[in-house]
Amino acid sequence: MIDPVYTASENRYSQLPYRRCGRSGILLPALSLGLWHNFGSRKPFNDAKAMAHYAFDHGICHFDLANNYGPEYGTAEENFGRLMATSLRPYRDELFISTKAGWDMWPGPYGNWGSRKYLMASLDQSLKRMNLDYVDVFYSHRWDPGTPLEETMQALVDIVRQGKALYVGLSRYPAEKAAEAFHYLADRDVPCLLYQDRFNLIDRQPEQAGLLDLSRQNGTGFISVSPLQQGLLTNRYLQGIPADSRMASGALNASVLTDAMLAALRGLDAVARRRGQSLAEMALAWLLRDERVTSVIIGASSVAQLQDNLKATENLAFSEEELQEIERLLEFRN
């Protein structure tokens, strides 16, 4: 059976708000689609294709990948490459595609961290897997304490100059090293477009470390990953640990679901319901209420989850009372 030809929705750019990415000409959708865990070889390809098409039809034009996304490693890029060779090929110039290198990808000393050799080789492999001539953003996925920062940053500069990436980004860098990297890149006329880190209602580390303000001062966009704390900030765990959940299987650490955390989640859910939102929708809206956040990367295991997440942008306004109650519910973290 031949698949029907995909034609993107004519209304795709009226579905989401778009935000300026730092001091650049780039606008990103408020919600972007991350392909970390549900786009690899262990999931049906048709499910991944349906999610990508639905996302694009509803204004999500930014797709976020990394060399080792899957599972198995590389297979998220391979599956995305199948789309880029077929249904999404006519829309390449409408898509903003990122990938990364920095975590383990292949054996030996040159398949991990931040050396020039690893970053260059990894991006070449990623481009082949994704059927692309270039990516829009290439990230250094983490700071490498064993490699001079100048080596890692110069590799990013040269990647842009070679035309293999239009922009560069950093992910999961300590604030001090991010500041040094920002300066190095700016001095070579390859400014850092995006800084990516885990940031959500529960995990405020980037804000506490000053990374949101640092990014803004540098003219760098901030993009949040893991906005739902790997499913905690949904209705999934409000009654404990479901038998079919990632926490039950050991993929997530069950020790985080303490009595205090469970009480907080239930309280947050009550706030969300009063707002006419699900807990997940409110968690996404809470991030997007902050003008320092350019975009929020969502993951999804189904089109239905995507549909629910997209509703978050319908109500981004919080009263002072709501914000105070949210902070009170989460005081136990301090």
What are these regions, as identified by a protein language model?
Residues I2-Q15, D144-R333:
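Beta/alpha (TIM)-barrel catalytic core signal, keyed to glycine-rich beta->alpha loops juxtaposed to Asp/Glu
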Residues L33, L65, T99, V137-S140, ...:
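Conserved beta-strand positions
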Residues K43-A55, G114-M130, A178-F182:
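Short, acidic/polar
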Residues K43-D47, T75, N79, Y110-Y118, ...:
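Alpha-helix N-cap and loop-to-helix initiation/capping positions
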Residues L127-T147:
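Active-site groove signature of glycoside hydrolases
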